[in-house]
């Protein structure tokens, strides 16, 4: 099988109108068929050979043969579209079963805590498997304690571009290291970007916009609810559970999970989230 690539252009007919002159030089409007071209790429040389052979037998152009093949395939594609919802539902059911079985095998028990369940959902169905480490250098309006406006702008522009390119809902930028150079008034550091391709699954909403950076030792000693009470943090909706999604600088990024029915109560935040464990502002 050859790996060569061949390109063809196809034309599709679209309805339209244009003015023309009638027999008595009167202006008339007639129906026209504007042409819309599409480029087709063949990576499989054997497929191109079959099309070429069929074109010679039927005395047709390559584009006509390809158009004929596409027309034959349209009913199949329409049927796929109609059943696409059912296919997604089956995939979700299989994923739910896989998640529960994975937890049961790892624990050797049938009981599964909600935190375990949601944590595995996060890893398998919410967070993108793409890992994007970043080395940054900013010679901008920034300082050691607070991130500068220009620094935030550059990061958010990068996150927005990544979300668009990879078709993601949200993106989280987390500094692993951040150093401020007083002499050069610059910031350098290393970070990771977490991409989120969906925020809901099986009736649960994973609210990345309300993720909190909390002390690991305090969480171990007091637990999440007491830590929130001591910090005076009140969530705008009932949280069914919290899951840890990242560990850095002796701190943990904790993400709240709520029921999809309570999503209307959440606070709207930008889709691009920055978490900086090395300044007085933990997130922006």
UniProtKB/Swiss-Prot annotation:
Superkingdom as given in the UniProt entry: Bacteria
Positions with biased composition (Polar residues): 1-10
Ranges where the record places region Disordered: 1-28
Protein name: Uncharacterized protein YagM
Provenance organism: Escherichia coli (strain K12)
Species lineage: Bacteria, Pseudomonadati, Pseudomonadota, Gammaproteobacteria, Enterobacterales
